[in-house]
Amino acid sequence: MTLLVQYTLIFASVLALVALGGCFSEHSGVINIGLEGIMVMGALGGALAMKFIPASTPGIVLFILIVLTSVLVGMVFSLFLGVAAIHFNADQTLVGTALNLMGTAAAVVIVRAINVAENPDNVSSTVVYRQAKQVFLVKIGDFEFNWFMLLVVLAIIASHVVLYKTKFGLRLCACGEHPQAADSVGISVYKMRYAGVLISGALGGLGGLVYITAGVSEWKFENGVAGFGFLALAVMIFGQWRSVNIGLAALLFGFFRALSNVYTGFAPLVALKLPSSLYNMLPYIISLIVLAFISQKSRAPKAEGIPYDKGQR
């Protein structure tokens, strides 16, 4: 049971962070389908930071440097979406799909180049970060507490305050609802949309780091992030683009994802003799069912996915 709770919380943390990132982007009016690719690049930045930053670095400094690296890499990668969708009015869904493909491919190429430079016989896409990973973890009895679990709670609260209680958040939401009206009162729609995309990249990149620290002490980047970017989109829609609802939805999806990892520890589930692949499919099946039922009632930002034309009224 302890393991189920532990995995549920860490997977929910990943989904909540990435879904919050998507929420900021879509509230600004830009659909971010590329969360999967952003997660991979953020994970790459964090993994390389854990690999190359000296182990003698003080724990809190190491923690901050690793997090900042993931956040910055995610933000830089998200600029591809920002420039293409905001500046050149490209189709946002196509750009996001391209980012997903490019993220994993670029990560594999970079990691293999580094590994070959260190050892010509090592052509794997694996980064090992065994020692540095411990800076995120605290043992509480049998429970392995990850500091990101606390960070996510703070992120949910901060997101709610920023989006609905600050001038910046209200302006951001205005650009996703009626950009022409926002522009008419002096709000720079382009700047707000870039801000939304950059925040999305920061949270998506951080989510990628949390994902790889939830597993073993190395990561093979050919595996990507197992569709968590797409699950986060389902969490965002299920949460109706609201921070607190997204946190609750992430717990639900995180539970089913965790169940696929630890179901062998529950005798009643083992007695059912269901194939392991069914448990692995559970979170994705749930996402399809949820989206099928709520798609007609979802209240997405009205101008999301629509390129802003300053001359249109």
Language-model-derived ranges and their functions:
Residues 219-284:
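Transmembrane alpha-helical segments in multi-pass inner-membrane proteins
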Residues 24-45, 64, 86-99, 171, ...:
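Short, non-helical or kinked segments that cap or interrupt transmembrane helices
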Residues 103-165, 266-278, 303-313:
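Transmembrane helix-bundle core of multi-pass membrane transporters
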Residues 159, 177-191, 263-313:
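Cytosolic-side transmembrane-helix boundaries in multi-pass membrane proteins
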Residues 18-19, 43-47, 104-108, 149-161, ...:
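Hydrophobic core segments of alpha-helical transmembrane domains in multi-pass membrane transport
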Residues 141-220, 244, 248:
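Helix-loop-helix "hairpin" substructures at the membrane interface of multi-pass membrane proteins
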Residues 1-19, 31, 45, 54-66:
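Membrane-interfacial amphipathic/re-entrant helices at transmembrane-helix boundaries
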Residues 57-106:
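Alpha-helical transmembrane segments within multi-pass membrane transporters and channels
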